[in-house]
Amino acid sequence: MQEAYVNINSIPTHIFTWGRWIEETITEKEIVICITGNPGLPGFYTEFAGTLQKELGDLPVWVIGHAGHDDPPEASIREVPQLSGNEELFNLDGQIRHKIAFIEKYVPSDVKIHLIGHSIGAWMILQLLENERIRSRIQKCYMLFPTVERMMESPNGWVFTKVAMPLYSVFGYIFFSFFNFLPVWLRLMLIQIYFLIFSIPRQFLGTALKYSKPSVAEKVVFLADDEMARVRGIQREIVEQNLDLLKFYYGTTDGWVPISYYDQLKKDYPKVDAQLDTKKIDHAFVLRHSQPMAVIVRDMIQQHRRV
């Protein structure tokens, strides 16, 4: 595994790679790129992506998070712009431009991309397919637990808009500022207690600590709020025009994407390649189900390799 912060659209962006670094010459004719969900900290995806690359063996796997969701170390000379006055860098449109810039800079035009999108990453993939320069490079898109429609109407969307956002608007900045005022050891201990309660592996402690920074949390919430406003009905024209490129994977216990969304997709597009999970994998699969999900995605990719 290799990792570094690289400037994409003038924003320091944390990139993780397995098999080949982004600045190395790519000799393979295919590559796997994973666009994260929200929060877009690629550190949550290390077990998933590492397992996937090991299972595939010969394909590089890269993970890119979202602009502003993972600040460089304090000693770094690179700084992420503040949210205020730079909203266009961190909303959905800004995140899409961010992904286009990354692909165009680091992926050679003759290399085909197996593009994984988790949660809102799947919605971003639909927007990327509108860009012919990107679309022409794609081998297949794997839409995992895809929040591509009616986010606000979902059970979790209702909780976010009716409960979480009002609370964050009043107490969010104060809470995160106070939390970050605490000594690091105490912050880690509190996060570890939370992890124990919800059975989250300790390996994500460092990533969760980054997530708790006020400058990161506000951008995560800002993007989520934009998702609620923008992700409404499914984008029928994009889906219809790209059915051959899309593979959907839906959960059965997903508060963001109820099974009814899967049923409606199958009804509206009888020929769509959509699969319903049988292993009770969570929406946030990277926290507890990285390895089984990596095996599932491996099988998907193997079916759609270039001949």
Swiss-Prot record:
TM region positions: 166-186, 188-208
Effect of deleting the gene: Viable and fertile but displays phenotypes that appear to be the result of increased juvenile hormone (JH) and insulin/insulin-like growth factor (IIS) signaling. For example, under nutritional stress shows reduced male survival, sensitivity toward oxidative stress, decreased locomotor activity, altered cuticular hydrocarbon (CHC) composition and desiccation protection, increased nuclear foxo levels and larvae are unable to adjust their developmental timing to their nutritional condition. Six day old adults also display a significant reduction in triacylglycerol (TAG) storage levels.
CC terms in the record's Gene Ontology section: endomembrane system; endoplasmic reticulum; endoplasmic reticulum membrane; lipid droplet
Gene3D superfamilies the UniProt entry points to: alpha/beta hydrolase
GO BP terms: lipid droplet organization; lipid storage; negative regulation of juvenile hormone metabolic process; regulation of lipid storage; triglyceride storage
Region (Potential amphipathic helix required for binding to lipid droplets): 157-200
One GO MF term: serine hydrolase activity
Active site: S119, D254, H283
Keywords (A to Z) from UniProt: Endoplasmic reticulum, Hydrolase, Lipid droplet, Membrane, Transmembrane, Transmembrane helix
Membrane topology qualifier: Multi-pass membrane protein
Tissue spec. comment: Expressed in accessory glands.
Catalysed transformations (reactions): a cholesterol ester + H2O = cholesterol + a fatty acid + H(+)
Annotated EC: 3.1.1.13
Localisation per UniProt entry: Lipid droplet; Endoplasmic reticulum membrane
InterPro entries on file: AB_hydrolase_fold (IPR029058), LDAH (IPR019363)
Quaternary context: Interacts with the juvenile hormone hydrolase enzymes Jheh1 and Jheh2. Also interacts with Hmu, Cpr, Gp93 and Pvr.
Leftover remarks: 'Sturkopf' means 'stubborn person' in German. The name originates from mutant larvae which do not adjust their developmental timing to their nutritional conditions.
Family: Belongs to the AB hydrolase superfamily. LDAH family.
Function comment: Probable serine lipid hydrolase associated with lipid droplets. Appears to lack or have very low cholesterol esterase activity. Appears to lack triglyceride lipase activity. Involved in cholesterol and triglyceride homeostasis; stimulates cellular triglyceride accumulation and cellular cholesterol release. Involved in negatively regulating juvenile hormone (JH) and possibly, insulin signaling activities such as triacylglycerols (TAG) storage, and thereby plays a role in the endocrine regulation of organismal growth and survival.
Record's protein name: Lipid droplet-associated hydrolase
Gene encoding the protein: sturkopf
